[in-house]
C-alpha cells in the first residue's frame, strides 16, 4: 500500500524526504493547537535521521486535491502476550480548515489496514482528555 485514495480527491501516501519541511510545519501546528509549541525541539535534521535514515517511525501525508490537509506519525511496539508487533499512533493532525470532514477517520482506516497487512496484533493511540 503506497498510496490510497480514500474518497473523491482525498488520498494518503507515505512521506518522502522531500516532505520534511511540511512535516515539521505540521508538527509545530499540532504543538500550537495543544499549547505545547515551546516544547518542540525537532528540526529537519532530526526528522530526516529518524524517519528516513534509521527508519524508526513512519509518516503518512493526507492530501485533498494535491493540498496537504494533515499527517500521522506512527511506529511499531510489541505485545509480549500476543507475540506480535503492534502499531502505536503518536500523532494524527488535520489542519483546522479541514477538520470535521472525515479526514482524521481516513488516517485511522489507512493505518488499521496497514496494521492488518503487516500482521500486527493491535493498533493503539491515546488522546488528550480535552480533545
Give residue ranges: language-model regions.
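Conserved acetyl-CoA binding element of GNAT-fold acetyltransferases
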Residues: 84-96
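Conserved GNAT-fold acetyl-CoA-binding loop/helix
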Residues: 24-49
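A short helix-loop-beta-strand connector motif used in the catalytic cores of GNAT acetyltransferases and
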Residues: 49-61
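Conserved GNAT acetyl-CoA-binding A-motif
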Residues: 116-127
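Conserved acetyl-CoA pyrophosphate-binding loop and the N-cap/start of the following alpha-helix
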Residues: 98, 102-110
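A short beta-loop-alpha structural element at the N-terminal edge
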Residues: 11-23
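Active-site acidic-Proline motif in GNAT/NAT acetyltransferases
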Residues: 95-97, 101, 129-130
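Conserved beta-strand in the GNAT
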Residues: 61, 67-75
Amino acid at each position: 500500500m503506497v498510496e490510497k485514495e480514500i474518497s473523491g480527491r482525498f488520498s494518503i501516501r507515505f512521506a518522502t524526504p522531500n516532505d520534511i519541511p511540511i512535516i515539521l510545519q505540521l508538527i509545530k501546528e499540532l504543538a500550537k493547537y495543544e499549547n505545547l509549541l515551546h516544547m518542540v525541539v525537532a528540526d529537519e535534521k532530526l526528522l530526516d535521521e529518524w524517519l528516513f535514515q534509521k527508519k524508526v517511525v513512519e509518516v503518512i501525508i493526507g492530501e485533498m486535491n494535491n493540498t496537504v490537509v494533515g499527517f500521522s506519525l506512527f511506529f511499531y511496539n510489541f505485545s509480549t502476550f500476543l507475540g506480535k508487533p503492534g502499531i502505536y499512533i503518536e500523532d494524527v493532525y488535520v489542519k483546522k480548515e479541514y477538520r470535521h470532514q472525515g479526514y482524521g477517520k481516513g488516517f485511522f482506516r489507512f493505518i488499521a489496514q496497514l496494521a492488518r497487512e503487516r500482521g500486527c496484533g493491535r493498533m493503539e493511540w491515546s488522546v488528550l482528555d480535552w480533545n
